[in-house]
Amino acid sequence: MRNLILVGPMGAGKSTIGRLLAKELRLLFKDSDKEIELRCGANIPWIFDKEGEPGFRDREQAMIAELCALDGVVLATGGGAVMREANRQALHQGGRVIYLHASVEQQVGRTARDRNRPLLRTANPEATLRTLLETRDPLYREIADLVVETDERPPRMVVIDILERLQQLPPR
């Protein structure tokens, strides 16, 4: 197995499920946002404030290219990673892509108290999440080998579902 790459909106459970999946498969877990923070010595909101979203996306693109070149990694990506064609290509070529789908209602509940999400610093975070999902959902689906629903499911059950469904995929 090369890599397992988790894509999906914020609040879908990419980091939580990614850690569990990596532990189960005895693989290394990487979170592209956390890796950017470690490399920069600053958190994502600070990078957004100082460099804007384009500056952050440039850093993200470089990090995704680097992480997708590894072998034996479970990679959790940021929700907007799929917005750039270069990222979609790197993710698709980097391993099996798993789209963790979550409804806007679930995303709202899971992100409500998280201050580390610059795109949700709006008057109406739910409307923002809805707009983001409408824009990004087709891009997640474009590169996904699997689409896995996370609504109302404990992370452990999602991991079991992923493992079972991965075995059914034909080699590529």
UniProtKB/Swiss-Prot annotation:
Domain of life: Bacteria
Cofactor-binding details, from the entry: Binds 1 Mg(2+) ion per subunit.
Family matches, as Pfam families: SKI
Gene Ontology biological process: amino acid biosynthetic process; aromatic amino acid family biosynthetic process; chorismate biosynthetic process
EC number: 2.7.1.71
SUPFAM superfamilies documented for this protein: P-loop containing nucleoside triphosphate hydrolases
Subcellular location: Cytoplasm
GO CC term, one of those recorded: cytosol
Cofactor field: Mg(2+)
Residues the record lists as binding substrate: D33, R57, G79, R136
Molecular function GO labels: ATP binding; magnesium ion binding; shikimate kinase activity
Positions of ATP binding: G11, A12, G13, K14, S15, T16, R117, R153
Pathway in which the depicted protein is active: Metabolic intermediate biosynthesis; chorismate biosynthesis; chorismate from D-erythrose 4-phosphate and phosphoenolpyruvate: step 5/7
Residues the record lists as binding Mg(2+): S15
Reaction equation(s) it catalyzes: shikimate + ATP = 3-phosphoshikimate + ADP + H(+)
Described purpose of this protein according to its UniProt entry: Catalyzes the specific phosphorylation of the 3-hydroxyl group of shikimic acid using ATP as a cosubstrate.
Oligomer status and interactors: Monomer.
Family to which this protein belongs: Belongs to the shikimate kinase family.
UniProt name for this protein: Shikimate kinase
